[in-house]
Amino acid sequence: MTPLALSMIIFAYLLGSISSAVLICRVLRLPDPRNVGSQNPGATNVLRIGGKKAAVAVLLCDMLKGTIPVWGGYFLNIEPFMLGLVAIAACLGHMYPIFFHFKGGKGVATALGAIAPIGLDLTAMVMATWLVVVVLFRYSSLAALVTVLLAPLYTWLIKPQYTLPVAMLCCLIVLRHHQNVKRLFAGTEPKVGEKNKKPSDDEESRVV
């Protein structure tokens, strides 16, 4: 590992550790997303507590946390495998942010942002897959899982040299969603737009 690659990995983690959801909610004087709703500091929970505009702002900021370091590494000619580590570092920062007591989100938006520099065609395929699954089934977690499982295949079809880094990133996202997988099989996973029906639902972790 070169010093440049190591520097980009550290930068990616620190950038990922900036919790967009928490900061935007503070600016808009909304409740801390870590304490209400699903208690997940991501766009899905912010949509629930703050509406569409706040959620879109969080989504875009979370995506940029993945795009900026990976794009930077891409233009600095960092090899594909190391770019995968940069992307993973950004997502780990989002999931376990050092600036916010290591309590972060699921990393889906940040992962999408990290994949974006590979190509607009890949980004469009990934986003279309997520949207179709959400529209058909209304499970954001299912959409995220289906999307990340297909993302390595899409990458192989478009730019095969990035298949391994994308697969590494997708494995991290799947592992982060293990509780969602359990709830999907149990039939207890909340759908997009549903409100919490009881206090225990606050313990649920949503995606994005």
Curated annotation (Swiss-Prot):
Disulfide linkage: none
Keyword Secreted on entry: no
Alphabetized InterPro entries for the sequence: G3P_acylTferase_PlsY (IPR003811)
Catalytic reaction(s) noted: an acyl phosphate + sn-glycerol 3-phosphate = a 1-acyl-sn-glycero-3-phosphate + phosphate
EC number: 2.3.1.275
Compartment list: Cell inner membrane
Predominant place of localization: membrane
Keyword set, alphabetical order: Cell inner membrane, Cell membrane, Lipid biosynthesis, Lipid metabolism, Membrane, Phospholipid biosynthesis, Phospholipid metabolism, Transferase, Transmembrane, Transmembrane helix
Any single GO CC term annotated in Swiss-Prot or TrEMBL for this entry: plasma membrane
GO BP term (any one): phospholipid biosynthetic process
Pathway: Lipid metabolism; phospholipid metabolism
Topology within the bilayer: Multi-pass membrane protein
Function recorded in the entry: Catalyzes the transfer of an acyl group from acyl-phosphate (acyl-PO(4)) to glycerol-3-phosphate (G3P) to form lysophosphatidic acid (LPA). This enzyme utilizes acyl-phosphate as fatty acyl donor, but not acyl-CoA or acyl-ACP.
Family assignment from sequence similarity: Belongs to the PlsY family.
Subunit annotation: Probably interacts with PlsX.
Listed name of the protein: Glycerol-3-phosphate acyltransferase
Organism: Vibrio cholerae serotype O1 (strain ATCC 39315 / El Tor Inaba N16961)
